[in-house]
């Protein structure tokens, strides 16, 4: 090995095993063009068949017999893919002749019949009996166990194994029937590299693969390249295709001299294999192998049915629980509480060691404390803000290299509410387990005539490995259940939002008519009360103040409803003396709250085209905010200036300091800070939210500056925009 020629697994994983350029020697191969002209033939054709098939020639009846020519004519004149087989006598031997077409090339394979017709008929009848028998199984484990026993009894192989692929493409021997003197491989695991991806594809395309003698000498196909395309002949569907020398060496290291594999294909994927091994050469006749092809299809169908039944039962149970959970959530006043039910809630929906519900700033862990790990997961998911489902079975454990690690290796998370940060998490603990590998799962470097290459391991004695850092993987069924729940909850939240919107519209109607009209009547009645009586005057003032406060609250709610429903605020800009307007608002505030110290610096003659009522609403809101949230007894500074192209109204007050989170949420409605403020128990926390909307309706904005425990709100309106007199 040198720095110039690095050695990788490419020798195995990138090996073009579908174009080996050779076949196994127990048969012969002829490839033909679409008009029947010979393109190439295996080098043993004359020795096996007694004639030469030279490129450019045509097969004759004297060479292959009338049955073969009729079969070939059928393929050459047909449309689409073609495959067929016949038996014919050539010289002293009976041959099975197998034909197929692939990529515009026609292939004829000649294989000597090694068994008499009676034996084949008996075998076929026996195979049919077993096919009928295996269909009675109701679980996969008993099916595989029974089939391995029957296959060994029928074929006489020394060992038959049922080999099932796992989620990581490694395989495990899950059933075995063997000669008593052979070591058992049952329960052993084999790495994915033992059967690389291109080999798995061929197992799907060609479900029966036979090696009659592992120690065979490959018979080359001549010429190696198709003279029509200058490409190698693709032997993917050839029954005689030569096998990878790495695979032959692998079998030799196991002590195997002959093998046959029968694929189990489920849902278009290689689910498993029946692998047959013999310690001496063994050739199974082609007609018998064709019975196994039917057997492969039947077993694949049964496994698929059983797996689908198992998954269907899991989905049935989970669907019942999911629908019950959805009903409880739909009927509950508190969605968070319905989801966080400890007994039959989300933790019972998917097999897990614990769960967590997060919604609107509230979190609840079930069967443990998972809040910190959930926070770490969300922090990682910030890199992909559009992702609504996440899963892993190897979340890192806490360490110096991974400070955001968690106690659970398995994490499955779904987001069902974006605005309220609604998430559900399922967690699985680390699963420390021992794997019994069939030999140490590695390949060794050897130097051969073609340079460095990787060779398979030489020992298949059980080698144990302790695997850490992984949980039980989340299955496709788990993910499907989680996704269905996510969609259910999203629909529930949308329906809830629609209902809230309908109620808001009704509230707007009530506030706008049924409540506002009586308030106006109360105000008018208060104004008509006699002003000569001191008691009456005080009563009138109380009634006026209370009704005015209620009207302001009603107006704020109406404004917010319009904003959140997308209607927007209406502004009617007119030429306005802003200086006079601000003085008036300051004066009204000073009268209403005599304990509030207000200092002013108002430039005279500041005019703008604004909606005076809306502008006054913003000014009053900013002063009210300063009174409620500023330090008691400290003055509030109000300034009005024209700065270039902007009219700027600033309200400054001292405060006890605000966190970054509080600053970020200043303009959000219904803030917790407003609800907890004892000096503003009647407020809704929507004044700044509406003020910002009014500023934006004037094509302006409200800036905030907070430093050294002093906060300044500045309403900025563009003069040019204002001078146009436009409205929005």
UniProtKB/Swiss-Prot annotation:
<dbReference type="InterPro" id="IPR035965">
    <property type="entry name" value="PAS-like_dom_sf"/>
</dbReference>
<dbReference type="InterPro" id="IPR016132">
    <property type="entry name" value="Phyto_chromo_attachment"/>
</dbReference>
<dbReference type="GO" id="GO:0007234">
    <property type="term" value="P:osmosensory signaling via phosphorelay pathway"/>
</dbReference>
<dbReference type="InterPro" id="IPR036097">
    <property type="entry name" value="HisK_dim/P_sf"/>
</dbReference>
<dbReference type="GO" id="GO:0009584">
    <property type="term" value="P:detection of visible light"/>
</dbReference>
<comment type="function">
    <text>Photoreceptor which exists in two forms that are reversibly interconvertible by light: the R form that absorbs maximally in the red region of the spectrum and the FR form that absorbs maximally in the far-red region.</text>
</comment>
<feature type="binding site" description="covalent">
    <location>
        <position position="12"/>
    </location>
    <ligand>
        <name>a tetrapyrrole</name>
    </ligand>
</feature>
<dbReference type="InterPro" id="IPR003018">
    <property type="entry name" value="GAF"/>
</dbReference>
<dbReference type="GO" id="GO:0000156">
    <property type="term" value="F:phosphorelay response regulator activity"/>
</dbReference>
<keyword id="KW-0808">Transferase</keyword>
<dbReference type="InterPro" id="IPR001294">
    <property type="entry name" value="Phytochrome"/>
</dbReference>
<keyword id="KW-0597">Phosphoprotein</keyword>
<feature type="domain" description="Histidine kinase">
    <location>
        <begin position="510"/>
        <end position="721"/>
    </location>
</feature>
<dbReference type="Pfam" id="PF00360">
    <property type="entry name" value="PHY"/>
</dbReference>
<dbReference type="Pfam" id="PF02518">
    <property type="entry name" value="HATPase_c"/>
</dbReference>
<feature type="domain" description="GAF">
    <location>
        <begin position="139"/>
        <end position="303"/>
    </location>
</feature>
<keyword id="KW-0675">Receptor</keyword>
<feature type="region of interest" description="Chromophore binding domain">
    <location>
        <begin position="17"/>
        <end position="495"/>
    </location>
</feature>
<dbReference type="InterPro" id="IPR043150">
    <property type="entry name" value="Phytochrome_PHY_sf"/>
</dbReference>
<feature type="modified residue" description="Phosphohistidine; by autocatalysis">
    <location>
        <position position="513"/>
    </location>
</feature>
<dbReference type="GO" id="GO:0009881">
    <property type="term" value="F:photoreceptor activity"/>
</dbReference>
<dbReference type="GO" id="GO:0042802">
    <property type="term" value="F:identical protein binding"/>
</dbReference>
<keyword id="KW-0157">Chromophore</keyword>
<keyword id="KW-0716">Sensory transduction</keyword>
<dbReference type="InterPro" id="IPR003661">
    <property type="entry name" value="HisK_dim/P_dom"/>
</dbReference>
<keyword id="KW-0418">Kinase</keyword>
<dbReference type="GO" id="GO:0030295">
    <property type="term" value="F:protein kinase activator activity"/>
</dbReference>
<dbReference type="Pfam" id="PF08446">
    <property type="entry name" value="PAS_2"/>
</dbReference>
<dbReference type="GO" id="GO:0005524">
    <property type="term" value="F:ATP binding"/>
</dbReference>
<dbReference type="InterPro" id="IPR005467">
    <property type="entry name" value="His_kinase_dom"/>
</dbReference>
<dbReference type="InterPro" id="IPR036890">
    <property type="entry name" value="HATPase_C_sf"/>
</dbReference>
<dbReference type="Pfam" id="PF00512">
    <property type="entry name" value="HisKA"/>
</dbReference>
<dbReference type="InterPro" id="IPR013654">
    <property type="entry name" value="PAS_2"/>
</dbReference>
<dbReference type="InterPro" id="IPR013515">
    <property type="entry name" value="Phytochrome_cen-reg"/>
</dbReference>
<dbReference type="GO" id="GO:0006355">
    <property type="term" value="P:regulation of DNA-templated transcription"/>
</dbReference>
<dbReference type="GO" id="GO:0000155">
    <property type="term" value="F:phosphorelay sensor kinase activity"/>
</dbReference>
<keyword id="KW-0547">Nucleotide-binding</keyword>
<dbReference type="InterPro" id="IPR052545">
    <property type="entry name" value="Light-responsive_reg"/>
</dbReference>
<dbReference type="InterPro" id="IPR029016">
    <property type="entry name" value="GAF-like_dom_sf"/>
</dbReference>
<dbReference type="Pfam" id="PF01590">
    <property type="entry name" value="GAF"/>
</dbReference>
<protein>
    <recommendedName>
        <fullName>Bacteriophytochrome</fullName>
        <ecNumber>2.7.13.3</ecNumber>
    </recommendedName>
</protein>
<keyword id="KW-0067">ATP-binding</keyword>
């Amino acid at each position: 090995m040198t720095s110039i020629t690095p050695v990788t697994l490419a020798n195995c994983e990138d090996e073009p095993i579908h174009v080996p350029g050779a076949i196994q020697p127990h048969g012969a191969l002829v490839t033909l063009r679409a008009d029947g002209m010979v393109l190439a033939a295996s080098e043993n054709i004359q020795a096996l068949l007694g004639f030469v098939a030279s490129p450019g020639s045509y097969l004759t009846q004297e060479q292959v017999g009338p049955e073969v020519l009729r079969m070939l004519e059928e393929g050459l004149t047909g449309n689409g893919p073609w495959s067929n087989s016949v038996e014919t006598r050539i010289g002293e031997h009976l041959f099975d002749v197998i034909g197929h077409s692939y990529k515009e090339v026609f292939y004829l394979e000649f294989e000597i019949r090694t068994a008499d017709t009676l034996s084949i008929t008996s075998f076929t009848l026996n195979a049919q009996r077993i096919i009928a028998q295996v269909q009675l199984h109701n679980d996969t484990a008993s099916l595989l166990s029974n089939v391995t026993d029957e296959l060994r009894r029928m074929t006489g192989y020394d060992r038959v194994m049922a080999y099932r692929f796992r989620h990581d493409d490694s395989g495990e021997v899950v059933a075995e029937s063997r000669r008593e003197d052979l070591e058992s491989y049952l329960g052993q695991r084999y790495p994915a590299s033992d059967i690389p991806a291109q080999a798995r594809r061929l197992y799907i395309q060609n479900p029966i693969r036979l090696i009659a003698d592992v120690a065979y000498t490959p018979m080359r196909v001549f010429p190696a390249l198709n003279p029509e395309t200058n490409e190698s002949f693709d032997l993917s569907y050839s029954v005689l295709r030569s096998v990878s020398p790495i695979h032959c060496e692998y079998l030799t290291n196991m002590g195997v001299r002959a093998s046959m594999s029968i694929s189990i294909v489920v849902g278009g994927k290689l689910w498993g294999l029946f692998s047959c091994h013999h310690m001496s050469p063994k050739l199974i006749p082609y007609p018998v192998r064709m019975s196994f092809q039917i057997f492969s299809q039947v077993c694949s169908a049964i496994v698929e049915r059983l797996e689908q039944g198992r998954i269907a039962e899991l989905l049935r149970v989970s669907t019942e629980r999911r629908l019950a959970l959805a009903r409880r959530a739909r009927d509950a006043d508190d969605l968070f509480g319905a989801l966080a039910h400890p007994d039959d809630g989300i933790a019972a929906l998917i097999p897990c060691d614990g769960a967590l519900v997060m919604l609107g700033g509230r979190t609840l862990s079930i069967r443990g404390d998972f809040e910190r790990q959930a926070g770490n997961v969300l922090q990682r998911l910030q890199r992909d803000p559009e992702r609504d489902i996440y899963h892993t079975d190897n979340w890192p454990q806490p360490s110096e290299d991974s400070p955001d690690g968690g106690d659970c290796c398995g994490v499955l998370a779904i987001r069902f509410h974006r605005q309220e940060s609604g998430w559900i998490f399922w967690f699985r603990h680390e699963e420390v387990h021992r794997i019994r590998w069939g030999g140490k799962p590695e390949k060794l470097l050897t130097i051969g005539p073609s340079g460095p290459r990787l060779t398979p391991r030489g020992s298949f004695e059980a080698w144990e490995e302790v695997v850490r850092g992984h949980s039980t993987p989340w299955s496709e069924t788990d993910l499907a259940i989680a996704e269905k729940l996510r969609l259910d909850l999203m629909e529930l939240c949308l329906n809830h939002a629609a209902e809230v919107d309908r109620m808001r519209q009704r509230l707007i109607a009530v506030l706008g008519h049924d409540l506002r009209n009586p308030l106006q009547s109360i105000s008018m009645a208060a104004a008509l009360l006699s002003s000569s009586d001191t008691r009456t005057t005080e009563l009138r003032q109380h009634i006026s103040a209370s009704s005015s406060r209620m009207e302001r609250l009603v107006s704020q709610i109406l404004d917010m409803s319009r904003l959140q429903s997308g209607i927007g605020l209406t502004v009617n800009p007119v030429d306005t003396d802003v200086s006079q307007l601000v003085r008036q608002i300051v004066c009204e505030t000073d009268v209403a709250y005599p304990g509030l110290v207000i200092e002013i610096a108002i430039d005279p003659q500041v005019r703008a085209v604004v909606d005076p009522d809306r502008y006054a609403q913003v000014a009053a809101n900013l002063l009210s905010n300063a009174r409620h949230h500023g330090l008691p007894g400290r003055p509030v500074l109000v300034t009005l200036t024209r700065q270039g192209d902007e009219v700027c109204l600033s309200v400054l007050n001292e405060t006890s300091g605000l966190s970054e989170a509080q600053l970020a949420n200043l303009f959000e409605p219904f803030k917790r800070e407003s609800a907890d403020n004892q000096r503003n128990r009647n407020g809704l926390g929507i004044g700044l939210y509406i003020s910002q909307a009014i500023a934006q309706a004037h094509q302006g904005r409200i800036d905030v500056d907070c430093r050294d425990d002093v906060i300044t709100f500045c309403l900025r309106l563009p003069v040019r925009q204002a001078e146009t007199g436009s409205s929005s």
